[in-house]
Amino acid sequence: MEREGSGGGGGSAGLLQQILSLKLVPRVGNGTLCPNSTSLCSFPEMWYGVFLWALMSSVFFHVPAGLLALFTLRHHKYGRFMSVSILLMGIVGPITAGILTSAAIAGVYRAAGKEMIPFEALTLGTGQTFCVVVVSFLRVLATL
């Protein structure tokens, strides 16, 4: 994989690294003591990385579901508003609960003194969305 300033043709490995790395904070001259230039070391970097993946994966799941609901319920008197609620929950849910859970994850990593690689942020962020989707489809809350 190529370094940022090398200027060569990166190929697919360079593109994958660029997608997963998020490039949140420039490492030049900001005083961050991180042994690896691609890892996330500070709390805001870790929090933002996990939160961004949670938000985007939630939008990825909820937008098609909302559009499908809008299409199938377009002639229903009140049913068409359900699609709006699906779309809103795809954004409002991760913004409210995702902020807290991402901060908790980043806090645990920071307290342990562990750095987070971008793939861990991807896994933890999409894992939050996966848990929400599983609870929604299994209807666990309706059995309580």
Swiss-Prot record:
Classification from the root reads: Eukaryota, Metazoa, Chordata, Craniata, Vertebrata
InterPro entries attached to this UniProt entry: Transmembrane_pr_170
Q: What stretches pass through the bilayer?
A: 51-71, 86-106, 117-137
Report the glycosylation sites. Answer: 30, 36
Residue numbers on the Cytoplasmic membrane side: 72-85, 138-144
Bilayer topology term: Multi-pass membrane protein
Record topological domains on the Extracellular side: 1-50, 107-116
Protein name, as recorded: Transmembrane protein 170A
- Is the keyword Phosphoprotein assigned to this protein? no
In the UniProt record, does the keyword DNA damage occur? no
- What quaternary structure, including any partners, is listed in this protein's UniProt entry? Interacts with RTN4.
Family of the protein in this entry: Belongs to the TMEM170 family.
Gene Ontology process terms (BP): endoplasmic reticulum tubular network organization; nuclear envelope organization; nuclear pore complex assembly
